[in-house]
Amino acid sequence: MQVDLLSSAQSAHTLHLFHQHSPLVHCMTNDVVQTFTANTLLALGASPAMVIETEEASQFAAIASALLINVGTLTQPRAQAMRAAVEQAKSSQTPWTLDPVAVGALDYRRHFCHELLSFKPAAIRGNASEIMALAGVANGGRGVDTTDAAVNAIPAAQTLARETGAIVVVTGEVDYVTDGHRAVGIHGGDPLMTKVVGTGCALSAVVAACCALPGDMLENVASACHWMKQAGERAVARSEGPGSFVPHFLDALWQLTQEVQA
């Protein structure tokens, strides 16, 4: 399958839409990344909410623009709340995104993620090892880290997309986004982004938000990857290391939104 490139004009158009619609994103994400995820969404103009109580999660999924399910710090009570939210999202036609953190390394979350696939996510975002494991190609990864190159996961991503109907994102040195029939590659970013906890998880939240936008969902999701890589490059140019990267990254996201409004 040919891998196309996303144009800067497409990315800018989607960011303009993002700012106009300001999606309300219900983030059922892991404990390690909640603040960074919320700040990333805010910097881009979205509205984050972290609602985890089972009864509230179901109720909120019905009114949110989009739902994120991230299994990074999964527990049985949290799985119950996530299941309720996903069931309600399907009923309410709220697009939801799955981030199958470490799905290839741990059995409980692998079974849980496979169960959730029956509720038809709008998007799935993971590293190469996670996507390959979720597709049943291989069980791999070193915890949350990948042991495979993103390009090697393209066939698995295409299969997973066709089987689930989801837009599948494989992140790495190059991000690949596919609906099973088309594929887009997004270059850029910097290795320093892997030295900060939460950049991938925050991307999943932005992907979730983009699934709520009008237009071509594949292009919208690919645009999310492009913004994060752009902001990463800008932040690295101003940073001395991981500690100073985070505030510069959030500033860079904010600046991107200001540029498309100018």
UniProtKB/Swiss-Prot annotation:
Keywords: ATP-binding, Kinase, Magnesium, Metal-binding, Nucleotide-binding, Thiamine biosynthesis, Transferase. ATP binds at R125, T171. Its EC number is 2.7.1.50. The keyword Metal-binding applies. Substrate binds at M50, G198. Disulfide bonds: none annotated. It catalyses: 5-(2-hydroxyethyl)-4-methylthiazole + ATP = 4-methyl-5-(2-phosphooxyethyl)-thiazole + ADP + H(+). HAMAP family: Thz_kinase (MF_00228). Catalyzes the phosphorylation of the hydroxyl group of 4-methyl-5-beta-hydroxyethylthiazole (THZ). This is Hydroxyethylthiazole kinase. It comes from Escherichia coli O157:H7. The gene is thiM.
